Curated annotation (Swiss-Prot):
Protein source organism: Fusobacterium nucleatum subsp. nucleatum (strain ATCC 25586 / DSM 15643 / BCRC 10681 / CIP 101130 / JCM 8532 / KCTC 2640 / LMG 13131 / VPI 4355)
PANTHER family: ASPARTATE--AMMONIA LIGASE
Pathway involvement of the protein, from the record: Amino-acid biosynthesis; L-asparagine biosynthesis; L-asparagine from L-aspartate (ammonia route): step 1/1
A Pfam match: AsnA
Lineage, broadest ranks: Bacteria, Fusobacteriati, Fusobacteriota, Fusobacteriia, Fusobacteriales
Identification of the protein by name: Aspartate--ammonia ligase
A GO cellular component annotation in the UniProt record: cytosol
HAMAP family in the cross-refs: AsnA (MF_00555)
GO MF annotation terms: aspartate-ammonia ligase activity; ATP binding
Annotated localization: Cytoplasm
Keyword Protease tagged: no
Catalytic activity: L-aspartate + NH4(+) + ATP = L-asparagine + AMP + diphosphate + H(+)
UniProt GO BP: asparagine biosynthetic process; L-asparagine biosynthetic process
Entry-linked Gene3D superfamilies: Bira Bifunctional Protein, Domain 2
């Protein structure tokens, strides 16, 4: 049966605004976040850009004054520095609209060269750097997802409700034990299908098999205190990752993870020095994909239905045949 979107293009544009406004407003209230302005590009020598998995090349250019700058991959490090500079109180934080270009992305139905997300970060105490605190924050964020689903399906009754009452917590190692014969990505799909919504914890370090579930930069998340929010998405038959987040590295975990990742050359960068010398505050933070959220709540088959990006002629032809209306 041919795909028919529940909303036409004009309805979709209006609904995108409704979803984003509602989610943003409730997220800021739930986590006590203040909206701030954020950079589109940074100076590489600052160490503030997010190296992601370590292989993605940032888009860079030189300015008229001769400086070389990079388009951000994410604002994971910049936000922590901003909290320090703005003198934000404990248990309060900031959020921003983050726009990025990921030139090495493998584009498909859920991946684009253009990334738009809410990046958020809040200050916590040293004592809050534990798994229970992390789970508590995840539950608060999940409550915002639930409220958003209730709101948008009331506004547009033809849209479907998909979220279970509660989110399930599971570690990457537990996932490997449960589905030993599946690839890491297929484990996520299987768990999302079984539970409806999962928070997949402890991503970045090696599992008992000797493999990593997924790569993570060594200098922002603590690999023992991080995770991804993943929802079952029946329309595509996958587990759709909506958010990556975690308690950030302290001086001890940064030291350990730089050694493991063979990235000890980063120690001398200003950002890393400020963590190792206990200058920066302890924080928790993450990114929440705006286009992914709109895809999920508006029952869209392709991310290009909720964001304007560029796609190959082949993708345009496939979408035309499948009745997918790209923005």
């Amino acid at each position: 049966m041919a795909y028919i979107s529940s909303l036409d293009i004009l309805e979709t544009e209006i609904a995108i605004k409704k979803v984003k406004d509602f989610f943003e407003s409730h997220l800021s209230k739930e986590l006590d976040l203040l909206r701030v302005s954020a950079p589109l590009f940074v100076i590489p020598e600052s160490g503030l850009n997010d190296n992601l998995n370590g292989t993605e090349r940032p888009v860079s250019f030189d300015t008229k004054s001769g400086e070389r700058v990079e388009i951000v991959h994410s604002l994971a490090k910049w936000k922590r520095m901003a909290l320090y500079r703005y003198n934000i109180e404990n248990d309060k934080g900031i959020y921003t609209d983050m726009n990025a270009i990921r030139r090495d992305e493998d584009t498909d139905f859920i991946h684009s060269y253009y990334v738009d997300q809410w990046d958020w970060e809040k200050i916590i105490s040293k004592e809050d750097r534990n798994e229970e605190y992390l789970k508590d924050v995840v539950r608060k964020i999940y409550s915002v997802f639930k409220k958003t689903e209730e709101y948008i399906t009331t506004e547009y009754p033809k849209l479907t409700k998909k979220l279970p009452e509660e989110i399930t917590f599971i570690t990457a190692q537990e996932l490997e034990n449960k589905y030993p014969n599946l690839t890491p990505k297929n484990r996520e799909h299987a768990a999302a299908k079984e539970y409806g919504a999962i928070f997949l914890m402890k991503i970045g370090g090696k599992l008992s098999s000797g493999e990593k579930h997924d790569g993570r930069a060594p200098d922002y998340d603590d690999w023992d205190l991080n995770g991804d929010i993943i929802f079952n998405y029946p329309l595509l038959g996958i587990g759709l990752e909506l958010s990556s987040m975690g308690i950030r590295v302290d001086e001890k975990s940064l030291d350990e993870q730089l050694k493991i990742a063979n990235c000890e050359d980063r120690r001398s960068l200003p950002y890393h020095q400020m963590i190792l010398n206990k200058v920066l505050p302890y924080t928790i933070g993450g990114g929440i994909g705006q286009s992914r959220i709109c895809m999920f709540f508006l029952d869209k088959l392709h991310i290009g239905e909720v964001q304007a990006s560029i796609w190959s002629q082949e993708v345009h032809e496939i979408c035309r045949q499948m009745n997918i209306k790209l923005l």
